[in-house]
Amino acid sequence: MTKKDIRILAFESSCDETSTAVIKNGREIESLIVATQIKSHQRFGGVVPEVASRHHIEVITQITKEALAEANATWDDIDAIAVTYGPGLVGALLIGVSAAKAASMATGIPLIGVDHIMGHIMAAQLKDEIEYPALALQVSGGHTEIVLMKDPIHFEIVGDTRDDAAGEAYDKIGRVLGVNYPAGKTIDEWAHKGKDTFHFPRAMMEDDDYDFSLSGLKSAFINTCHHADQIHEKLDKYDLAASFQASVVDVLSHKTIRAIKEYKPKTFILGGGVAANHGLRDRLAEEIEKLPADIKPKVILPDLKLCGDNAAMIGAAAYNLYKAGKFSDENLNADPSLELPYADSMLK
């Protein structure tokens, strides 16, 4: 008797990407559709929630059909329907949740609600097998966290940002530099052309915990630029980008390496939109390579196309919940403030 393949149709609509995917056995992408809204939000310098919701409504039915067609699947081939239910923009989340619930009720296919952050981390599962326990640095527009995983469904935060997330900081300083939203890719490219000449602060780098603070860096950057404007001094944009990125990468990599030394995970994962940053990817790979062999974890850096918001990562995470029998019912609702649990040590 052959083992039955498990196919999951996944929805993602937590922010400004509408995405659907069909994932087989939690590892194989049979289809992935992403309808981006970046051009609609660029003129505003960031995501406008109402605009995002309207775009989700316009495309979600069509991209659901496209995901099934690309996977050569019908509803009869789908074993579960997965959807991001938080965190994110409440209006945007509701579009995906409503679509997934409607499909589940109409077809009788089980429903699985997925935490968006769990999805970002599980994008690694689409590239390679994760050995547990695992540790992840999750860096995106809304979150900057170090997450410990004892298995595929039990996650706890051991380090968190106390103010700005890394991606948020990139976008805010991007506005100062005149870079279109989203600014991360351009600043990363500029950083590789400049030098760390401004020596911006590395907040909390030597603190005993694994928390982060990026608001001071953001303020120092903005003040430097404003002061230069006042005295009519022209600053090199490449050096500004390099100095900003050096500060972010130094702090993130330093605390991540310390966490690896303490928790000794078998696998290290970099997840989230900022995981596409080449400066961060390169530094972490270099620092982990220097670790002693007995504590050096396997490293999984997700493919660049899976760093941003997408439904494939939601399908991967949902597969683990499916295998554990963790299903949702018709009462599933959007939870814009949904959080992974914090480690007990952080609550003392």
Swiss-Prot record:
Transmembrane segments: none annotated. InterPro entries: ATPase_NBD (IPR043129), Gcp-like_dom (IPR000905), KAE1/TsaD (IPR017861), TsaD (IPR022450). It holds the Pfam family TsaD. Binds 1 Fe(2+) ion per subunit. The keyword Transferase applies. Gene3D superfamilies: 3.30.420.40. Its main location: cytoplasm. GO terms for molecular function: iron ion binding; N(6)-L-threonylcarbamoyladenine synthase activity. It is found in: Cytoplasm. Substrate binds at residues 138-142, 171, 184, 188, 277. Belongs to the KAE1 / TsaD family. Required for the formation of a threonylcarbamoyl group on adenosine at position 37 (t(6)A37) in tRNAs that read codons beginning with adenine. Is involved in the transfer of the threonylcarbamoyl moiety of threonylcarbamoyl-AMP (TC-AMP) to the N6 group of A37, together with TsaE and TsaB. TsaD likely plays a direct catalytic role in this reaction. This is tRNA N6-adenosine threonylcarbamoyltransferase. It comes from Lactobacillus gasseri (strain ATCC 33323 / DSM 20243 / BCRC 14619 / CIP 102991 / JCM 1131 / KCTC 3163 / NCIMB 11718 / NCTC 13722 / AM63). The lineage of its organism: Bacteria, Bacillati, Bacillota, Bacilli, Lactobacillales. The gene is tsaD.
